[in-house]
Amino acid sequence: MQKLIIFALVVLCVGSEAKTFTRCGLVHELRKHGFEENLMRNWVCLVEHESSRDTSKTNTNRNGSKDYGLFQINDRYWCSKGASPGKDCNVKCSDLLTDDITKAAKCAKKIYKRHRFDAWYGWKNHCQGSLPDISSC
């Protein structure tokens, strides 16, 4: 019985671990979450320069705010550091750090709808006019 409980805990922990995507793995995941094909190279570039395709990535900014996950979503405006979902995306920041990118994708699309790619410095500084090749994906 004790072995069964330990096995169940291991399975639960593995299911919520972070993930680092390959470039094509990221493309497939973004397609699965309904990202527009005509913007795909922009999204891939953004994610590569913001988080290196790592869902567990965090970054503390000079102003004390923190960015979370694949899309480096900021806690000042978009996600709540507390135990309850909140802010503009109505999501907990910790939910943006798992291998299930559903909530992160939904929030990133909301940010894009409001600010386009200009909301992300990784895109502004690295992706304008220089997008990755995803033709083999």
Curated annotation (Swiss-Prot):
Enzyme Commission number(s) of this protein: 3.2.1.17
InterPro entries (UniProt xref): Glyco_hydro_22 (IPR001916), Glyco_hydro_22_CS (IPR019799), Glyco_hydro_22_lys (IPR000974), Lysozyme-like_dom_sf (IPR023346)
Catalytic activity field: Hydrolysis of (1->4)-beta-linkages between N-acetylmuramic acid and N-acetyl-D-glucosamine residues in a peptidoglycan and between N-acetyl-D-glucosamine residues in chitodextrins
Residue positions of the active site: E50, D67
Top-rank EC class of the record's enzyme: hydrolase
Keyword annotations from UniProtKB, A to Z: Antibiotic, Antimicrobial, Bacteriolytic enzyme, Disulfide bond, Glycosidase, Hydrolase, Signal
Name the record gives this protein: Lysozyme
